Amino acid sequence: MRRMGAGFVGILSAELHFPENGSLKGKRKELLSVKAQLQRRFGASVAEVDHHELWQRARLTLSCVSRGYREVEELMDGAERYLAGQAFELGRIERNVVTLDD
């Protein structure tokens, strides 16, 4: 039986700091915009995964899928550049690419 190509999944997790923000409502508003842009521009699935109760911090994790390793790396590079260009401060970033063959 012929084996199907598994494809690659990229995972990027980023710490965000909103020094000018003064409320959870303000943070949520900014995060909604950022998440929508990441989804639209890079086809990424995005979730806030930590610091829900803090109004100046957030951790976003996104994932993207492609049939090629290079394509996944390019998508994550683009997402990281997008995040770095925003008004908030970008902290620690973790990245990984996995495949079902791993």
Give the residues covered by each predicted segment.
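Short, charge-patterned binding micro-sites
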Residues: 47-68
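C-terminal structural segments of small proteins and small subunits
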Residues: 67-102
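A short linear hydrophobic-aromatic micro-motif
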Residues: 44-50, 92-94
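A structural signal for short, well-ordered beta-strand segments
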Residues: 12-16, 60-62, 93-97
